Amino acid sequence: MGCGEVYFPPKMFCNNEGRESRMEDVFFGESLGEIYTASVNRHPTTKFEYLEAPFSMYVSFRADGGRVMVSGRLTDFRASLDEIGIGGFIGEGVVPRFRRVYDDGLIHYSRLSFSLLDDYYETHLARDLEPVVPGGTPSERPGIVGYGAYVPKYRIRVEEVAEASGKNPDLYRGVVKEKALPFLDEDTRTFAVEAAERAMFHAGADKNTVDVVSVGTESNPYAVYPVAVSVAEACGIPSSVNSYDARFACKAATSQFGLMIGAIQAGIYRNTLVIGSDNSQARPGDALDYSVGAGAAALLLGGEGVIATLDGVAHYSSDTPDFYRREGERYPSHGGRFTGEQAYFRTVVSAGKSLLERTGLSSGDFDYFVAHQPNMKFPRSAARALGFEKDQYELGNAVDYIGNMYAGSCIAGLCAILDVAKPSERIMMVAYGSGAGSDAYVFTVTDEIEGKRERAITLSGQIFNPRREYVSYQFYRRAKDQ
């Protein structure tokens, strides 16, 4: 047979099959699919034992007038093997999710995991809206262009944690009511991708205009290997982006706001994506075990299509080791009662007062107040200490139902406010990070927010979603410690 001749004749079922066939990259990560066929792996291989009984399937996607089949598995799904009827899933719509696949020292991620379209997760892919909205109005002051928060589907009530630890549940009901936890294939990276995608869709921004991806976290699955690079690539942001992780406990993300706004104002960057993401850690039975949550929140900052301008900044820092984790230790340590008055309250209130002094404003000049939320009591007490009333601070307190999201906590509270805030309303935000420091900001809502209202996936819609699922303490610890 001579060079260039066809060795395998084309097969009838595919015009591109055979020696002369070709392959091309096709990305379905931002497309809805349908379950074509499925099976339950009752005895998974070692790599997938953590999922117990993976639900494998072929997902059908429309492409060029035909269909393409992609193999994957169903995620965020827990059911007894005896309860699963495969036939009921055929034809169901599914959404690609960026999740962990397996861990062999290197954690492997992909979008070959799918959640059911009508499950807990609302997706912008199901909305009849263009992903990019051109021609955002330039703003005199840079600020927030879009926002997005991600809270996992699974929850545990604080009573469940107390009973598992042999404690009286009544003693802990003032910490949080319930809290979010990851599924077995979720972590800080997957949370960050979800929040980033929501923020960019809400903004209607072209991914090619995102010049920075910054992720604040204290629960990166790796000691060395930044979360931000995974977010940028998974979200389709060009490789020319400046990607990096930031660290300062729970204010790791908010500490970037002023720096990013300054760079945007100077013309160095166009849009910057700042994300706070954490699978908050706590030693089993420790006081933190009652409050730690999971999830992420993201802001796209820029100078066009701004929904809230940044109009004031103040900071406060001191060498206060109220909360820390030594290198090589799995769980953080804390100073117990020392974390309150001497750390959180002194720092948050000082930063808040400094902001009011620098801007010449008073608590009565604000419509909303949000602070870092380690538990239900602290942010409310700090708000009152700064002169705020309940109708100003209550909306931003999401901790009651999702727990302390660490680096995502304060931003998630801000997202809850932006979900309902009206043009000209003013927001004061005071973040906190153990060690210790606070970032205080003034945001003023603009008319642009109304045009993006239908693009938001609201925080309350996730917190109170009727499809959220409650789990046992054993499942909670397993998901936390994966």
Residue ranges and their predicted role:
Residues 97-128:
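OB-fold/S1-family single-stranded nucleic acid-binding modules
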Residues 41-42, 94-105, 433-435:
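Short, charged beta-turn/beta-strand-edge "cap" motif at the junction between a beta-strand
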Residues 76-97:
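Short nucleic-acid-contacting surface segments enriched for D/E, G, S/T with interspersed K/R
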Residues 195-211, 349-365, 386, 421:
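Phosphate/pyrophosphate-binding loops at sites that engage ATP/ADP/AMP, CoA/4′-phosphopantetheine
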